[in-house]
Every structure is written in C-alpha cells, then in structure tokens.
Amino acid sequence: FMVEQDWCHKGLTDLVEVDSMHERKQRMADLSDAVIALPGGCGTLEELLEVITWKQLGLYLNPIVILNINGYFDPLLEMFRRAVDEHFMRPQHAALWTVASTPAEAVGLIFSEPVWDANIRKLALV
C-alpha cells in the first residue's frame, strides 16, 4: 500500500509489497533477526511498542535494541520505569529490550542478546 502512495524507496534491490501497515510490520518482524529502534516519530514509536508487545507475548523472540541517541528515548524509558513502579508492567519486562547510546553499541547488542524462549508469554500477566 505504500507503493500506491509513492512512499517507497526506488533504489532498492528487493522491494516487498504488502496490502496494509499491519502486514508490513508482520513481514518485517518475520524477516528480521533483531530490531534496532532509531529516533523517529509516531510510526517509529508505534512499531517499537508493537514489537515489544509481541515479544512480551512470545510472538517475537529476537533482540530489540533502543538506540537512545542524545537521550531521545529518555521520556519513553522513564514511562516504562513508571509502568513498572505502578505495577502495569513486571520488573522482568524491562529485559524485553536493551538500550544503546551509539550505533556501534546497538549492533554489538544484537549479537550479544539472547533469543528469548516462547514461554516468555507467562510474564505477560501483571
């Protein structure tokens, strides 16, 4: 659907077309070995929170790294801490992602973080 809007990169060697944003996110997750979230807007935040939720539910098991350049994600990370403090999330949920300050650190983390077990979904209960 992004091709119809002309929102696609024309210089790619392989362009995967899908019918919806949900299908796009699912396809990206299916093809990925890890997720690195770069600073961005609403779409970036939505995709990051969705993949964290999928990991919490055992639907996505690969590493998730938040690239917190210049503290960009500090407010989001504080919200996560508050969610734990107010018992909306378990303390173990903070291990669903890791945080990097530099691109090199982010790449290193995707290779050092373990793949999660699908039984992680038992932590989905608060």
Which residues fall in each region the model found?
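A cross-family phosphate/adenosyl-ligand binding-site feature
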Residues: 1-31, 69-109, 114-126
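Hydrophobic alpha-helical segments, especially transmembrane helices
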Residues: 25-26, 48, 56
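A short, small-residue-rich loop immediately preceding and capping a beta-strand
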Residues: 32-43
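Short, acidic/small-residue loops that bind anionic groups at enzyme active sites
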Residues: 38, 52-78, 91-93
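Short glycine/serine/threonine-rich phosphate/pyrophosphate-binding segments
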Residues: 43-50
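Amphipathic, positively biased hydrophobic alpha-helical segments used for protein targeting
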Residues: 51-52, 113
